[in-house]
Amino acid sequence: MASLSLAPVNIFKAGADEERAETARLSSFIGAIAIGDLVKSTLGPKGMDKILLSSGRDASLMVTNDGATILKNIGVDNPAAKVLVDMSRVQDDEVGDGTTSVTVLAAELLREAESLIAKKIHPQTIIAGWREATKAARQALLNSAVDHGSDEVKFRQDLMNIAGTTLSSKLLTHHKDHFTKLAVEAVLRLKGSGNLEAIHVIKKLGGSLADSYLDEGFLLDKKIGVNQPKRIENAKILIANTGMDTDKIKIFGSRVRVDSTAKVAEIEHAEKEKMKEKVERILKHGINCFINRQLIYNYPEQLFGAAGVMAIEHADFVGVERLALVTGGEIASTFDHPELVKLGSCKLIEEVMIGEDKLIHFSGVALGEACTIVLRGATQQILDEAERSLHDALCVLAQTVKDSRTVYGGGCSEMLMAHAVTQLASRTPGKEAVAMESYAKALRMLPTIIADNAGYDSADLVAQLRAAHSEGKTTAGLDMKEGTIGDMSVLGITESFQVKRQVLLSAAEAAEVILRVDNIIKAAPRKRVPDHHPC
């Protein structure tokens, strides 16, 4: 019986696209490595910045070296590249820093995997080797961690060092000492809660970054109404989200016809009476400050002024949410049951000037740890980047307060982990040892890139660093001020254990996910169905 020769059958819809085997794997590697190459020049204390220009009606300009911000604002089409973008976003959400490191490490792992697959080593063999290497690296990192949580003086110094290390690679590096102090003082005010919502950051154009300061209490970027008290002590605050205009007729297309101007006056009088009744219901709460998410129109503003109540309108939603948190109040929208409404409180509300702008200052708030950091700067781009840099430092410090373990930076931890993985590879038989060696090489690429970005001879420096760790100098790292190998414990270059651990695990998992891919299927674009119905 003659054998039948079956032609390949296409099971996908017309327009669908499929990449198989080596083509799919190569496509994934190229996309991931390209993302790593894009952000690696921003790594380290001498990293460069990127300018991001958005097109369209609301075209904006952004100058940043924050890995998560860069990746979030570029559009990527490659599936593997999207995996790395999502991974950097998770890193930013989880620990706040290490977004560039995690992306670069994952890309370097895949670069090594590409050369191993070219040598006919199976992806599953590589993954098995990587998993053992990750365990060894994590254990080495754990063994090197130092915990000063029980010693208040040393722990504060650790926090100062961590904030300084985080800010070294940011725009704020030239004012590092000033912002390190601001960030540490703000986080220590939280008393271990780690609730960063209590730290409010306000950006005000003018002055220089060195003019930025930490303010006790809460600042609201609004003005007090006309003919209202400008200062209130022992404030009782009602925070609301309610319309302070008369209720409009809600029937679509409805109209009111009158046959005389007297009738118009009657309608206006009825509206005023209705608003007066609403204001009286609000005043029954026994308050001396009313803050509304929506507008407060002229008539109710006059009524509040006559009653000696400070009225603040159109407070932004985030500001209102945070104000409710720090004053201990709740946002109300109905006022029929005053006994059920939780009022906010603070010792003093007053109007203050920052630059040329008036703001409202709440001091002695119920949440004692609340504070505001006021950022000053010459341009909006500088202020935005300063806020991102400060956010990273605050997130890392909040993590360190929860888990006080620290490790050394400057490529020290990466070289320590690479040394442990290399030792494991030398004791491991078979092809998995080759995968472990590639893992160690990827880890060593991080100090290599840091040295390259600073303009130093990376081959020489990394060789010296590797030799130092082989001799048992476990605190040796890169000193990018002098371009030499230095003792990180003496230089105070410290990083959070949680950040380093998250970088290691996230990069290994993301690289493994991409390495497992052997097929990429793109769905057919959805076709628009013409509408033949008459209008």
From Swiss-Prot:
* This protein's GO CC annotations: cell body; chaperonin-containing T-complex; microtubule; zona pellucida receptor complex
PROSITE patterns assigned to the protein according to its UniProt record, in alphabetical order: TCP1_1, TCP1_2, TCP1_3
Q: What is its EC class?
A: hydrolase
Phosphoserine: residues carrying this PTM: 3, 60, 260
- EC no.? 3.6.1.-
Q: Which reaction does it catalyse?
A: ATP + H2O = ADP + phosphate + H(+)
Q: Where does ADP bind?
A: 44, 98-101, 168-169, 410, 495, 500
Binding residues for Mg(2+), per the UniProt record? 97
Glycyl lysine isopeptide (Lys-Gly) (interchain with G-Cter in SUMO2) cross-link: located at 248
Identify the residues that bind ATP: 44, 98-100, 495, 500
Q: Phosphothreonine is carried by which residues?
A: 261
User: Which cysteines bridge via disulfide bonds?
Assistant: none
Give the record's family classification.
Belongs to the TCP-1 chaperonin family.
User: What function does the entry list?
Assistant: Component of the chaperonin-containing T-complex (TRiC), a molecular chaperone complex that assists the folding of actin, tubulin and other proteins upon ATP hydrolysis. The TRiC complex mediates the folding of WRAP53/TCAB1, thereby regulating telomere maintenance. As part of the TRiC complex may play a role in the assembly of BBSome, a complex involved in ciliogenesis regulating transports vesicles to the cilia.
Q: Which NCBIfam families match?
A: chap_CCT_beta (TIGR02341), thermosome_beta (NF041083)
Name of the protein described by the UniProt record: T-complex protein 1 subunit beta
Q: Whose protein is this, by species?
A: Bos taurus (Bovine)
